[in-house]
């Protein structure tokens, strides 16, 4: 994952479900939110949140995006030719 750091969470190019899970877990822990609290505010089950944090490949996209939003994270999609992280 090509990345930028912000405090203790690494953000950047995501290529796998595991990358997304690592970012979600790091952001949740950085903000001091327990897994059950994050699941509740995202309206998903704790088991679901645990699965995406562990990189489950088949996690439902809509729920995953909701978790990201509730944690204050955005998703941007760029064509490879316009990748803002290329350097």
PLM regions: where:
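Residue-level signal for the short linker/turn that defines the boundary of a DNA-recognition helix
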Residues: 22, 32-33, 59
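DNA major-groove recognition helix of helix-turn-helix/homeodomain DNA-binding modules
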Residues: 62-78
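Alpha-helical coiled-coil heptad-repeat segments used for dimerization/assembly
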Residues: 19-22, 26, 37
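Basic nucleic-acid-binding interfaces
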Residues: 29
